[in-house]
């Protein structure tokens, strides 16, 4: 471990300048800067001055949402212990030590720029790996859903579906019984239809009265009876006329005697 990454206040050594910078910030939180003489710079005299490392200065413009490193509880407890040991020092000496530590920290962070670029590359690789992992998980879930759907389709193909009402049954026997109920309903419907047709025909025949001689139809029996009487009178007239024709003299026959003439005149 190099000596340049050592804290000038508590003489702790660190692996890189970034860790040393975080440690120096803890010193600034525990030991606020006193009123500085005019020889110190305005930045050091500002009570709101906060020590930042090289990475936070360069990346604040690029990645403002990136979180800074947090203090460890163990380091805070050690700093409190160091504070109790350094109470004997004067405030001016502590301020001078802080200024020297800040200068050395800035120099060490300048030299450690390649390390920050390497860490950025590692972070980028981690992000890419995380994205690939999420994509692979999404693809796995989609395949899982597709397999469930295919399994359901295969299971449905094993079932038996009624073509009339689209009901599904687990066995062919159940489907056969269901189809029998459909056939029974159809037969009952056909029987009702035939009965209704017969009734309609019967009503139509009973409501109409047809003459057997000329096939005329009448709405009532009385009208049909009057029509039949007309047929009877016509028959009598035809018979009478036929009798008259028979009683005529035939020139081809011999002349009748007087007795036959008297008999024909009586009729």
Swiss-Prot record:
Q: Where is the composition biased (Basic and acidic residues)?
A: 52-62, 83-97
The protein's GO terms of the molecular function aspect are: DNA-binding transcription factor activity; zinc ion binding
TM ranges: none
Where on this chain are zinc fingers (C2H2-type) annotated? 5-27, 160-182, 209-231
SMART domains on file: ZnF_C2H2
Q: Does the keyword Repeat apply?
A: yes
Q: Name one GO cellular component term.
A: nucleus
What is one Pfam family matched by this protein? Answer: zf-C2H2_6
Cross-referenced SUPFAM superfamilies:
beta-beta-alpha zinc fingers
Residue ranges with Basic residues bias: 63-73
> What are the UniProt keywords, alphabetically?
Metal-binding, Nucleus, Repeat, Transcription, Transcription regulation, Zinc, Zinc-finger
**Location, primary (coarse class):** nucleus
Which compartment or compartments is the protein found in? Nucleus
Q: Where is this region: Disordered?
A: 34-99, 181-204
- Do the record's keywords include DNA repair? no
Q: Which GO terms describe its biological process?
A: regulation of DNA-templated transcription
The UniProt function text for this chain reads: Probable transcription factor that may be involved in stress responses.
Please state what the protein is called: Zinc finger protein ZAT1
């Amino acid at each position: 471990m190099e000596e340049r990454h050592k804290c000038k206040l508590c003489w702790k050594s660190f692996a890189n300048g970034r860790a040393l910078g975080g440690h120096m910030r803890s010193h600034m939180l525990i030991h606020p800067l006193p009123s500085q003489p005019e020889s110190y710079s305005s930045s050091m005299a500002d009570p709101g001055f906060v020590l930042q490392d090289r990475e936070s200065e360069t990346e604040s413009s690029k990645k403002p949402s990136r979180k800074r490193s947090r203090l460890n509880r163990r380091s805070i407890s050690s700093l409190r212990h160091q504070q109790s040991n350094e109470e004997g020092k004067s405030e001016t000496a502590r301020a001078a030590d802080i200024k020297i530590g800040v200068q050395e920290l800035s120099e060490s962070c300048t030299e450690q720029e390649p390390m920050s670029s390497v860490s950025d590359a590692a972070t980028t690789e981690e992000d890419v790996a995380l994205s690939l992992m999420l994509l692979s998980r999404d693809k796995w879930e989609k395949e899982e859903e597709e397999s469930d759907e295919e399994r359901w389709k295969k299971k449905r193909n094993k079932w038996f579906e009624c073509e009339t009402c689209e009901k599904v049954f687990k066995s062919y026997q159940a489907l056969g019984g269901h189809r029998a109920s459909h056939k029974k309903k159809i037969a009952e419907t056909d029987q009702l239809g035939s009965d209704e047709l017969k009734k309609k025909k019967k009503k139509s025949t009973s409501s109409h009265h047809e003459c057997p001689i000329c096939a005329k139809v009448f709405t009532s029996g009385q009208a049909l009876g009057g029509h039949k009487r007309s047929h009877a009178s016509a028959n009598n007239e035809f018979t009478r006329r036929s009798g008259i024709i028979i009683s005529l003299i035939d020139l081809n026959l011999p002349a009748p005697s007087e007795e036959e003439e008297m008999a024909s005149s009586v009729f």
